[in-house]
Amino acid sequence: AVPCGQVSSALSPCMSYLTGGGDDPEARCCAGV
């Protein structure tokens, strides 16, 4: 299992994209996921 803190830190750069606020995911989002 992956620790929740690690998941949230990996997904935090993606949140605006995942919630429809960004056109493209950030590069660090793709690298983290």
Swiss-Prot record:
InterPro entries referenced in this protein's UniProt entry, alphabetically: Bifun_inhib/LTP/seed_sf, Bifunc_inhib/LTP/seed_store, Plant_nsLTP
Pfam families in the record: Tryp_alpha_amyl (PF00234)
Going by the UniProt record, its keywords in alphabetical order are: Antibiotic, Antimicrobial, Disulfide bond, Lipid-binding, Transport
Instruction: State the Gene Ontology BP annotations.
Output: defense response to bacterium; lipid transport
Extract the GO molecular function terms from the UniProt entry.
lipid binding
Cystine pairs annotated here are: C14-C29
Residues forming coiled coils: none
Q: What does this protein do?
A: Plant non-specific lipid-transfer proteins transfer phospholipids as well as galactolipids across membranes. May play a role in wax or cutin deposition in the cell walls of expanding epidermal cells and certain secretory tissues. Has antibacterial activity against Gram-positive bacteria S.aureus and S.epidermidis and blocks biofilm formation. In a mouse model, also protects against bacterial sepsis and has an anti-inflammatory effect. Exhibits antinociceptive activity upon oral or intraperitoneal application in mice.
Indicate the quaternary assembly: Dimer.
The family classification in the record reads:
Belongs to the plant LTP family.
> What protein does this entry describe?
Non-specific lipid-transfer protein
